[in-house]
């Protein structure tokens, strides 16, 4: 009878379903409901038997039999008496997250994303310190989160309440730990790969991440809220159950336990999956870009360091003043005692014109601070919403009166006054015409001195330049002008128009005038060198004005490196190419390299130059008449031809002479006069002081002498009296003889005893000493590639020389051709005056 009534009740339920579902009740729905009903019935019977509830029902049968029997006779459904409404939950559409274990497994994905400081440290330990370090750090993070979830779900008040009571000390503790970690990462980074045997270091990784998972609260999802796959507000809630159902094993402990197990297993699986993906990405990046692992690990370390430092800083403004300061002191949120800390949207400031007149300057309120909008507003004043101040267009319209310029009232009065004047202009027209008529001068008289002074003073006082009218408002804000220029110069449309304008201008001149980028760069380099050369000359002129010291000249100028060679010229008469010239090292490489191209600078100014040297006369202006220029050019050309003809005649007359005038000049320091001199003199025995010509023209040979040499003393002049006497004694003295003081120093240098200064014995004494010789290996035939033939060795041997004075360098003038020079030597071989 019981099963018959149960079957009847089931059919009644199906009839009710057909009425509810109407046309959606299909055969598939019927079979599905039948299978689920049978499965739930078997489960109900099985639980009924296992839980021994049948025993309690059998004991209570005398009490419940009457009510059940009466219900059967009355035709009531047996399901309404003994079966709970949850028995028919199979008819409801269950979501995927109705299973607590699956919900915890899916929600654990958000707990493993590397968007918090503990996860970043775990990722760094895995990628840099190896797999054991990564497992230890990740295990500390996961267990720290899992223990916190256990304390929250099962209500361990002995742990949570003291922990939450000490806020914000727990946050400060986590902040201090993170700062310490950042300091170690910056100064003592651990870049070694760890193994399983280093348990001490691995335990530090585990403990650090475990503590940070409880105390450090920095995460990217602070501003996004808690992300979950179910419809509950936070991750700390497994299902939406009522308070009355939180006291059973099946309704509370079992779902929460399954939820926590899902979180634990999901955290391990998602962490392993993310670590595997990061490893594949790092290896692929290193393989594709051919980057070494050491370099890539260093970049990963720096990136995680910067990201951790950023998270550490962003946590401070997130918690704010209320959480960190006012809440521990006992203040509540929006406490009236702290109103003076709140930002006000209006500030009253005194204008510089009037001290007692105040103007209101509007500032946007703090975002999301709507406490002022909750206050009671007057009926006359409309309530302003947050959007009225956040949107620029609405903000400008709300504050249109406050943005009105200060001279609005003045302009309105001027406008009305002008309108009034226009109405009465006809009445005053005659007066204006007569007033502006020019007055004829009847008498002329000279101005007095007072009147002239008044005119001069008035011209100065009432000059617009004196009041700087033209520059008014331009120089007050140079930063505004800079922004104005950047705004236009960064505009691509403006840049394209300027570019087209300049190109059209440059195309209007001849094509030969357009320099290439390399030509412009070379021209700029020459200008720069010439500028530094002229600056060095000015610096040299100011040397005599420098303050004299008690130190010797050598110690003061040359820093105890006074040697008397070419260093003297570098120190004293150097072309001071400053350190700015170093920029041309890379600049010159651009000119020579093929891979890099020198970019041309777009500008209006172009250098003026001639295609030919005699194209125009530099004295005449370029806009003079062409005929005048051509006549002057022809006259100048004729004059140059006559001068060249005269010079050729003089050259032919001087070809028979033994020696021409001394064309070379010498630059150096004169030790006797203590002056830096530029002199003309010839050096006996050295071919650089001669310039010879041959009557018979000979073919030109490319081999020539060098165009400069370095010398260590000054050469002798031809008209000195003792030149011939000294030269006859066989000593080569190509410079001025030493003074008495310098000769004594030379004697001390060579340890000459009983030395007396005399020009006669000076040569004899110094002739017997082993003095250093001039190094002429480059010119003589001893080297591999001599510049002169071997038959000239006898004419360039200087023999013994006197100890050097102060040196310099010499320039012989034009390059000497060897055939003419050989003829000159053959004709003057035995001449002693040479």
UniProtKB/Swiss-Prot annotation:
Sequence segments annotated as region (Disordered): 397-424
Membrane spanning residue stretches: 30-50, 101-121, 125-145, 167-187, 261-281, 303-323
Subcellular location: Plastid, Chloroplast membrane
Membrane topology qualifier: Multi-pass membrane protein
Highest taxon listed in the record's lineage: Eukaryota
Record field: compositional bias (Polar residues): 407-417
Keywords: Chloroplast, Membrane, Plastid, Transmembrane, Transmembrane helix
Predominant subcellular localization, coarse grouping: plastid
GO cellular component: chloroplast membrane
Record family assignment: Belongs to the ycf78 family.
Protein's recorded name: Uncharacterized membrane protein ycf78
